[in-house]
Amino acid sequence: AATLLGSGVYQAGIASDSTGTSTLLTVVSEHPLLSAGVNNLHLANSAWGGFTLLDAGGDAMRWARSALSAGQLSHQQMLDMAAEVPPGAEGLLFLPYLTGERLAEHTNSRAQFFGLQRKHRQPHLYRAVLEGVALASLRNLQQLRRHAQEPEAMIASGGGARSPLWLQIKASVYNLPLLQTRNQENGTTGCAIVAGVGVGLFSSFAQGVSRTVSIEREFTPDPRQQEHYLRCFELFEQLYRQAQPLYEQLDVISSFSFSPDEGTPQ
């Protein structure tokens, strides 16, 4: 709640994308959002924040750094490489369910790349990971949209908010303006606002936000990218649903254990 307040998300019509290890999407409403897969928290000004969770948000890029570059590339180098690839990663999709899904029906979901071809290189994979997190988050955002007022804009926070490329991808995928705050320490700012209201420094939470939170940059949806990402999402959704029956079979396969020497040729 403090992070939401410290990023300026405190009244109906505003949404939040908080991407750290996970990605939490929150839509502020005047009432709780009663839906499976949606949790609610009570905000400081008597509003409610309905939120969804994608377990592997920023953690997907952390995995990509470890698995695809053996930790040799910095996150900024990965982002620079991804920026060289066109939207859609030339037909490569990534489902980012590296650790399953805590708040979904299928907690044993798995991650996968789909559409790999010989032409694809590291930059394509990095771009696909960024886009895959955004597309998976769009699935969650649609749950919120079905039960809440359509947000006018979304404010980004967390480590993921430091990447202009990722924010532009998300703006086009969500089809929402995505705002980047000047101060990225949103949780600390939110706590300061609460303290300021408590001691009378601010007359209201709204005044506290207006005096401490400012927008650095706005990322607006690109119409051509948004149309292309919509087609990508339709395929993403098919992959997500059609893969679900296979996860139990994969659980059985992965439950077999072998000693290390059994995999070594004699």
Feature-to-residue mapping (PLM):
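Active-site core segments that coordinate phosphate-bearing ligands/cofactors
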Residues: 1-157, 161-261
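Intrinsic disorder/low-complexity segments
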Residues: 263-265
